[in-house]
């Protein structure tokens, strides 16, 4: 992680769970971290978990990644304040409690796609343009899911697996576009199994399933960022021991 000391990381969905763990660990590792979230006060509260030397490196910014105008304003702010972004972690993701074949739920399903897919794409576009403009060999990390590779039968998953399958395809498309452009920017998909987070249905927790913790995924992010410039971890799958899915 030495090469990233003092560099700028943008983390979406930074207010809780995986995003909060990643935000905290990147700041501890010496990066300047811009944590994006709708609940910005919860990102600000993460400073309590940081050593005094790291607290000034964490910047909490209100942003709803389902809104393109929010994304545009945030990346303009990052460019003005810090010069640009070196690492992007697309972590923001939502799951709505409904069925795919339900009724009067079109808005709920669109919210999932707008956040999990379009938010990821639009943030990646802004980060890439920032890296390209400054000739930075940066890194874009997508927090994907095992359901982005295989659809499992669990209640009210609705359009969530489709949104994560999109992330898998988007990762490969980005890799191809970066290669064709002669870019040294890396792109990585990290696909966790079941993680104990706020969006995890209570039925999974109460069912006694094996669970990962948010910190396990954050450690994976640190690992992929710490690889040599010649190494790209394209896909990393992480499951808890004994997972049924």
From Swiss-Prot:
Molecular function GO labels: farnesol dehydrogenase activity
Enzymatic reactions: (2E,6E)-farnesol + NADP(+) = (2E,6E)-farnesal + NADPH + H(+)
Entry-linked InterPro entries: NAD(P)-bd_dom_sf, Sc_DH/Rdtase_CS, SDR_fam
Active-site residues from the entry: 160 (proton acceptor)
Pfam family, one: adh_short
Enzyme class: oxidoreductase
EC id: 1.1.1.216
Subunit structure: Homodimer.
Family: Belongs to the short-chain dehydrogenases/reductases (SDR) family.
Protein name from the UniProt record: Farnesol dehydrogenase
Organism, scientific name: Aedes aegypti
Gene: SDR-1
